[in-house]
Amino acid sequence: MSTEFPTKNGINREWHVIDAENVVLGKLASRAAMILMGKHKPTYTPFIDAGDHVVVINAEKVKVTGRKEEDKLYRHFTGYPGGLVEKSLKRVRAEKPTRIVEDAIAGMLPKNKLGKQMYRKLNVYAGSKHPHAAQQPVALTVK
């Protein structure tokens, strides 16, 4: 008797919506990453993308603890000499609030092709409205 692995056709993908208002960023990101990877399912297999879709709303109202608002830095390199750009979490929240949640969740996913596939099932919105009502997402609470 051999182990049966789920196939692409045999995977039932659901949609989940998480309200990020007053939720700690790390707890939100770990819960969303777990759902994107499919670790909440009994058929979880590390080398198969069996995860569900996740919609995060109110990303601009996510909470961070301690002094991270001023101390946490987001860096990217432009490709030019001296082109390392550093922005504080406070500034990133003002310019593009969805990036805070997207980066936190992406950091908890695998760094390979499978991780990119999982990341594509993530949808983050700054406000409380999202265009995925037709998929009938199930509301999730993060403690």
Swiss-Prot record:
SUPFAM superfamilies in UniProt: Ribosomal protein L13
Pfam family, one: Ribosomal_L13
Organism annotation: Solibacter usitatus (strain Ellin6076)
Protein name: Large ribosomal subunit protein uL13
Entry's family note: Belongs to the universal ribosomal protein uL13 family.
GO molecular function annotations of the record: mRNA binding; structural constituent of ribosome
GO terms for biological process, alphabetical: negative regulation of translation; translation
Keywords annotated in UniProt: Ribonucleoprotein, Ribosomal protein
Lineage: superkingdom: Bacteria
InterPro entries linked: Ribosomal_uL13, Ribosomal_uL13_bac-type, Ribosomal_uL13_sf
Quaternary structure and interacting proteins, as annotated: Part of the 50S ribosomal subunit.
Entry's Gene Ontology cellular component terms: cytosolic large ribosomal subunit
Physiological role: This protein is one of the early assembly proteins of the 50S ribosomal subunit, although it is not seen to bind rRNA by itself. It is important during the early stages of 50S assembly.
Keyword Calcium: no
